[in-house]
From Swiss-Prot:
PANTHER family: SUPPRESSION OF TUMORIGENICITY 7 (PTHR12745), SUPPRESSOR OF TUMORIGENICITY 7 PROTEIN (PTHR12745:SF10). This is Suppressor of tumorigenicity 7 protein. The gene is ST7. It is found in: Membrane. It holds the Pfam family ST7. It comes from Dasypus novemcinctus (Nine-banded armadillo). Belongs to the ST7 family. It comes from the Eukaryota. Keywords: Glycoprotein, Membrane, Phosphoprotein, Transmembrane, Transmembrane helix. CDD domains: ST7. It is a multi-pass membrane protein. GO terms for cellular component: membrane. InterPro entries: ST7.
């Protein structure tokens, strides 16, 4: 009984829905019937005759004014549409049509029927888009005092944006501070220094923190749960103060290296002490975590100093030791520093070994990993690659692998080839990058352009094949080939990360929709005709009659038909009729 009642209700519901779907036709015929019945009381015939009389008395100037007014309104709508498209990257009319008119016309039903099946996929894609739009610390970032500031002194331009430096300040507070900093005077001063916006105030605070390292303090060291001892120790020198001075005050890489070595001595002592006490409470555990971050940062920057000063083998050894000592600290992306140093040494076998470990599907990709893999594949075939020969005989297996690797890299970050091929000028890389964005492309090309130039024919192979990637992903914002769809947020984030004098690369390139161009041309042509008709009514009348006579003439129709037949013959390539041959006896 319950099932029968449910079936009856479903049928009744479907009948009601069907009746409401076609109810507008009933209303339409009902309105027509009312108009026919009330035609005499409403004096419809008299009103129609009055309207026709009014239209007959209108002069051509009225129609010209009406046309000009409509063209003006259309032009204003066009200007607003163009402004909205430039600002938000989408058409206002299209957005209103999709968002508001489509649900009224029943377009939501198709999407809602699949909503339950695609809910998990949507959540996964949302999580992926959030992770791809995350801003990452640039593993190859330069030194502020020795490199960024020197660029400012020479050119007068600021290579870093306020947003980028603010992110760096947040990173420093996360890595170099903890809740127990107020117990040590030097760390308390540095905690305030990392929040300071003025560079000179930060440097002064770092010097002040180093001046109080001779203060003695009583440090309580618990041995067992039932007893404690008290011992007097000298407060160690503040390692984070040396870090700040090396980053911002040192004007050369050599000076920065000296300060980082002093920071290493102080940071190593703090790390060993906190390592022994890390299990005695959450406070000591937080101190050990902070000291670990400080030590890893110092060793990594020392390796980068050695790389800058030409001691590349020493830098490679320091990076390998650091990765073995702290294998879980992947947030610094030390393997990207190692890849760049190994490419400088032309140790391509070691580069391949590092890629085999980090070019994994479970790890986040980067332009360094994708383009380094493409460079190694291209190195095997680039010296003998020729576009003409490849078009004649086809691509070999090795060449196909190299082209696929280039397509994979270009799909991940399509901005890099323009910098590697020197189609766009490079600037100093920012301190933070957005993966798959223009900022990451600048950071990669700034350090790896020399490695691509060193491999003979690699840039030629890249030049011949990189644009073929876009044929495989005609709609990159909706669907990718090997990666997730390209994130929409890259342009906005890159504009905040990169300086204003740099022209941000945009992908995919926004093009004006066809209907905007068509509307612009139609409005312009109509306004021009209205203006000419108003100024020269007789001449435009003669011109209009002449055009009508031309289009209505028999010669024009014959010429049009002949042109159509000639075009069809050209497309079909109809051969001429064979000539008859006569044989003589």
């Amino acid at each position: 009984m319950a099932e029968a009642g449910t079936g009856f209700l479903e049928q009744l519901k479907s009948c009601i829905v069907w009746s409401w779907t076609y109810l507008w036709t009933v209303w339409f015929f009902f309105v027509l019937f009312l108009v026919y019945i009330l035609r005499v009381p409403l004096k419809i015939n008299d009103n129609l005759s009055t309207v026709s009389m009014f239209l007959n008395t209108l002069t051509p100037k009225f129609y010209v004014a009406l046309t000009g007014t409509s063209s003006l309104i259309s032009g204003l709508i066009l200007i607003f549409e163009w402004w909205y498209f430039r600002k938000y990257g989408t058409s206002f009319i299209e957005q209103v049509s999709v968002s508001h008119l489509r649900p009224l016309l029943g377009g939501v039903d198709n999407n809602s029927s699949n909503s339950s099946n695609s809910s998990n996929g949507d959540s996964d894609s949302n999580r992926q888009s959030v992770s791809e739009c995350k801003v990452w610390r640039n593993p190859l970032n330069l030194f502020r005092g020795a490199e960024y500031n020197r660029y400012t002194w020479v050119t007068g331009r600021e290579p870093l944006t306020y947003y980028d430096m603010n992110l760096s300040a947040q990173d420093h507070q996360t890595f170099f501070t903890c809740d127990s900093d107020h117990l040590r005077p030097a760390d308390a001063i540095m905690q305030k220094a990392w929040r300071e916006r003025n560079p000179q105030a930060r440097i002064s605070a770092a010097h002040e923190a180093l001046e109080i390292n001779e203060i003695r303090s009583r440090v309580e060291v618990p041995l067992i749960a039932s007893s404690t001892i008290w011992e007097i120790k000298l407060l160690p020198k503040c390692a984070t103060a040396y870090i700040l001075l090396a980053e911002e005050e040192a004007t050369t890489i050599a000076e920065a290296e000296k300060l980082f070595k002093q920071a290493l001595k102080a940071g190593d002592g703090c790390y060993r002490r906190s390592q022994q006490l890390q299990h005695h409470g959450s406070q000591y555990e937080a101190q050990h975590r902070r000291d670990t971050n400080v030590l890893v940062y110092i060793k990594r920057r020392l390796a980068m100093c050695a790389r800058r000063l030409g001691r590349t083998r020493e830098a490679v050894k320091m990076m390998r030791d650091l990765m073995k000592e702290f294998p879980l600290l992947s947030m610094f992306n030390i393997h990207e520093n190692l890849l760049e140093a190994l490419l400088e040494l032309q140790a391509y076998a070691d580069v391949q070994a590092v890629l085999a470990k980090y070019d994994d599907i479970s790890l986040p990709k980067s332009a360094t990993i994708c383009y380094t893999a493409a460079l190694l594949k291209a190195r095997a075939v680039s010296d003998k690659f020729s576009p003409e020969a490849a078009s004649r005989r086809g691509l070999s297996t090795a060449e196909m692998n190299a082209v696929e690797a280039i397509h994979r890299a270009v799909e991940f970050n399509p901005h890099v080839p323009k910098y590697l091929l020197e189609m766009k000028s490079l600037i100093l890389p920012p301190e933070h990058i957005l993966k798959r964005g223009d900022s990451e492309a600048i950071a990669y090309a700034f350090f790896h352009l020399a490695h691509w130039k060193r491999v003979e024919g690699a840039l030629n192979l890249l030049h011949c094949t990189w644009e073929g990637t876009f044929r495989m992903i005609p709609y990159p914002l909706e669907k990718g080939h090997l990666f997730y769809p390209y994130p929409i947020c890259t342009e906005t984030a890159d504009r905040e990360l990169l300086p204003s004098f740099h022209e941000v690369s945009v992908y995919p390139k926004k093009e004006l929709p066809f209907f905007i161009l068509f509307t612009a041309g139609l409005c312009s042509f109509t306004a021009m005709l209205a203006l000419l008709t108003h100024q020269f009514p007789e001449l435009m009348g003669v011109f209009a009659k002449a055009m009508i006579d031309i289009f209505c003439s028999a010669e024009f129709r014959d010429w049009n038909c002949k042109s159509i037949f000639i075009r069809v013959e050209d497309e079909l390539e109809i051969p001429p009729a064979p000539q008859s041959q006569h044989f003589q006896n």
